[in-house]
Amino acid sequence: GVNRRGNIFKLITALKQICNHPYQFLKSGETSKELSGKAEKCVSLVQSILDNNEKTLIFTQYKEMGDLLTKILCEECGSEPSFFHGSLTVPQREHLIEDFQNNDDRKVMILSLKAGGTGLNLTSATNVIHYDLWWNPAVEEQATDRTYRIGQDKNVMVHRLITLGTFEEKIDEMLKAKKELADLAVYEGEK
């Protein structure tokens, strides 16, 4: 019953953390990007985005992963990204948004998916990276929509990082089916 579901959820969470970076699961050890294909891909994407003098938002559902990405990107790219998360005060959040939107030197903002999901206008970003998958595709879309506000005049590239050969591929298939069903329900309801 409930106990079994709790154990399954813990297992899934552990597997997701391992896909993100082994350090997130182990809570100790090396934090090198080389230990995670996903971290390596994220760094490569961010470096390419920076080379094009563009800005990016990186969404993760885990604050610990945001902390780790901040460390890795600082080491690999030479500048510290902003990190917008639920523990920040309202003035701190407002400052981060203002700085990201108006400071040409501030190119990367990491956001915890829940904290960065509603009411934000981050149209200076031309790239969105979803580092890990959320169970509800609408939450992911809402996060992406931060860049599609009034005033956005550029194309926005959305990158979803999924570790090949893992259960993340199955989660992605499930999410796509769930989204198709939701889209169909909306379409049918509009008739």
Residue ranges and their predicted role:
Residues 80, 92, 107-190:
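SF2 helicase/translocase ATPase core recognition
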Residues 1-120, 190-191:
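Conserved Helicase C-terminal RecA-like lobe
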